[in-house]
Regions:
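Preference for long, amphipathic alpha-helical scaffolds in soluble/luminal domains
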Residues: 1-656
């Protein structure tokens, strides 16, 4: 077991709790019901995948895409419209997450989508949405991506959007803005968008429907499209960009043609079959629309497959439909496997073992080894060995998913996975950034000055190291280090990074799950696997913080608004408990040696009291950011496998 230099194992003040024996029947019964439900959700091929729901921008954009292309499925459009109307807030706006404040950009897109779908603008829900948008300064105040959509639908002039010429594709690597300097999701979204914006492509919009009523000033006369640019660097870049845009008419046609060819070749190489460009909805739509402008007919393989990749994201119910931003089978299968491994740790169940074997074999088959990948630009000498987040995304293995999957394979204790584990260890260790942490898809993606450019008003252009991803990498690599002797420096650097990232209140920030509870869980499970003593000051501060934020009903909950207001008194707090957050807090506290604490007992009781009749839990609220402050997610599996994991660990701690 790897030992940290700050190990206080000789400290006499710490004593491991002695578990008392109480009636375990309710816990055992809850575990059985939750396990049985999960086993029924497994697909024949061995994987699990649950719905991944975003805010209303994605389904609204699906309707907008249909009208952009003049490929309108009226029945589907009607079902999506039902979904959109059902999510309107009482004040007429639309929020980025359940219970959140209204968001101008989201509300503009939904209003436009519903108008395209045939809703009367004088209907009460449309009037309320319009009045709310106008009260916020109108559609001119929406974000860059919304204004680009409005420009393509000819609702605002092109000067309302940043100057993003396709000639960016020809810039040298040393240039301050280069494609390789931004995150994978930015690359895949931007490259086809360069083509669309440089050529000022407009929507077919067969009914010629507009939304001029959403502007307080005539869009042609509006002079305040970039009020969000406030930093000196941002204003400097905006000035340079506005100046450069005046020369666009004089750019040589051959240069534009060369850049367009390079951009189209770049994204066509990464179309990724029926899983789509980057396997994310915004990139897929941009690619689909760019292929149309480039002249590919509807029957062409690229167009056909690009459309299918988008359609595969739809969730169609009897009375409504929505579009997912992506799908999460590898992530869901990896985490479900870890939960079921905890269930089967000491009490072998043949059905569970068979399900685990099938799941792990499916995961092993999805490992990306010698595939091309953008990550190789920063780490050309590292051996491939990661996993994507989606079914297929060969250019973009996900470090976080890879750590979870590799850890599950390692715990599977099956020699058939030895080579997969070896490759995963080499790849994850090789993807460590210089500061000791890990980003999600790239190493050393820390060009923070780029977040000041006008295009980056979303603040999500980059993929820097984060505590949650780093905690899971530590979890896997520390376990692997029990078999390998070449990971000591990697682990020491990771611990140094995570200690530095701890907040003064004892928590850690959660980039990919909400929020400080998620981040703290991520790090504490890594610390536990790394062999840190339970009396380590960092662990004690984290445990004390988790105890301090427990709700009166025994559970835990955290508001997504902590990404907007991260002040200490808001962290780890919400007006209600959630099974997801309760489970994470319990797993974190047990990793900190608190299995016998009254706080853990109360949390377990909360889970027992709130389990549904089918064996799972039903959280109402979103549980992760796609991009903090901009885009949020609800993983529908989180209230199914995390509570099972927590209950199983509690049972195992008390018996062993």
């Amino acid at each position: 077991m790897f030992k940290d230099h700050n190990d206080p194992s000789e400290n006499p003040a710490y004593t491991k709790p002695v578990f008392s024996r109480q009636t375990e029947a309710p816990v055992d019964k809850a575990i059985q019901r939750a396990r049985d439900f999960l086993l029924k959700q497994q697909h024949e091929e061995g994987y699990w995948v649950f719905e991944l729901e975003a805010d209303c921008t994605i389904p609204a954009e699906y309707i907008l895409m249909m009208h952009f292309m003049d490929e309108i499925d009226t029945a589907l459009q009607a079902k999506i419209a039902v979904y959109l109307r059902a999510h309107q807030r009482a004040d007429g706006s639309y929020s980025l997450f359940t219970g959140g404040p209204g968001d101008t950009s989201c509300t503009v897109k939904v209003y436009y989508a519903l108008k395209l779908a045939g809703d009367d603008i004088d209907a009460p829900h449309m009037t309320m949405a319009r009045d709310w948008i106008l009260s916020q300064g109108g559609a001119a105040q929406s974000n860059v991506f919304t204004r680009i959509m409005l420009a393509m639908f000819e609702q605002v002039p092109w000067r309302a959007v940043p100057f993003i010429p396709v000639e960016i594709m020809l810039l040298p690597n040393w240039f301050p803005f280069h494609l390789d300097k931004v995150a994978y999701w930015s690359r895949t979204v931007m490259v086809p968008l360069f083509i669309l914006c440089s050529n000022k492509v407009t929507a077919r919009n067969p009914q010629k429907i507009g939304v001029r009523e959403l502007f307080t000033v005539d869009p042609v006369k509006e002079r305040n499209y970039f009020a969000h640019v406030k930093t000196p660097l941002g204003k400097l870049v905006l000035g340079l960009e506005r100046f450069a845009s005046t020369f666009e008419p004089y750019l040589p046609k051959k240069l534009r043609a060369k850049a367009t060819t390079k951009a189209s070749e770049w994204f066509i190489e990464r179309l990724n079959g029926v899983d789509g460009l980057g396997a994310i909805f915004p990139a897929m739509v941009n690619a689909y629309e760019a292929l149309d402008w480039l002249g590919y007919p509807p029957e062409h393989e690229y167009r056909r497959i690009a459309r299918e990749s988008i359609e595969r994201l739809l969730v169609i119910k009897d009375d409504h439909a929505y579009c997912q931003p992506c799908v999460s089978p590898i992530w869901d299968t990896g985490l479900t496997s870890l939960a079921l491994q905890e269930v089967n740790k000491y009490d072998q169940d043949d059905r569970t073992e068979a399900a685990l074997t099938a799941g792990l074999r499916w995961l092993a088959s999805k490992q990306l080894t010698d595939h091309p990948g953008d990550w190789r630009i920063r780490r050309p000498d590292v051996e491939g060995g990661g996993w994507a987040f989606q079914f297929e995304n060969t250019h973009y293995p996900d470090v976080d998913d890879s750590a979870v999957v590799a850890h599950a394979l390692l715990q599977g204790n099956n020699s058939e996975f030895d080579e997969h584990i070896r490759r995963a260890g080499n790849w994850i260790a090789g993807m460590q950034s210089h500061g000791g942490g890990w980003g999600a898809f790239d190493a050393d993606n820390t060009y923070h000055y780029l977040n000041h450019i006008p295009f980056a008003d979303h603040g999500a252009l980059l993929d820097p190291p984060t505590s949650d991803v780093s905690g899971r990498c530590l979890m896997f690599l520390a376990k692997l280090a029990e078999q390998r002797g070449d990971l000591g420096t990697v682990l020491e650097d990771a611990l140094t990074y995570l200690r530095k990232e701890q907040e003064t209140d004892g928590s850690w920030f959660g980039r990919w799950g909400t929020n400080y509870i998620y981040g703290t869980w991520s790090v504490l499970v890594g610390f536990e696997t790394a062999g840190l003593h339970k009396n380590d000051p960092a662990i004690r501060r984290a445990a004390a913080w988790l105890k301090s934020i427990q709700c009166s009903d025994g559970g835990w909950g955290e508001d997504n608004f902590t990404y907007h207001d991260p002040s200490a008194e808001k962290r780890g707090r919400f007006h209600t408990s959630m099974a997801f957050h309760t489970s994470l807090a319990l797993l974190a506290l047990m990793a900190a040696g608190e299995a016998d604490s009254p706080e853990v007992a109360a949390g377990i009781d909360y889970l027992l009291r709130n389990q549904g009749p089918e064996g799972h839990w039903n959280d109402k609220y979103f549980n992760a950011p796609g991009f903090p402050k901009v885009f949020y997610l609800k993983y529908h599996g989180y209230d199914k496998f995390f509570p099972l994991w927590a209950l199983a660990r509690f049972r195992n701690e008390r018996h062993h």
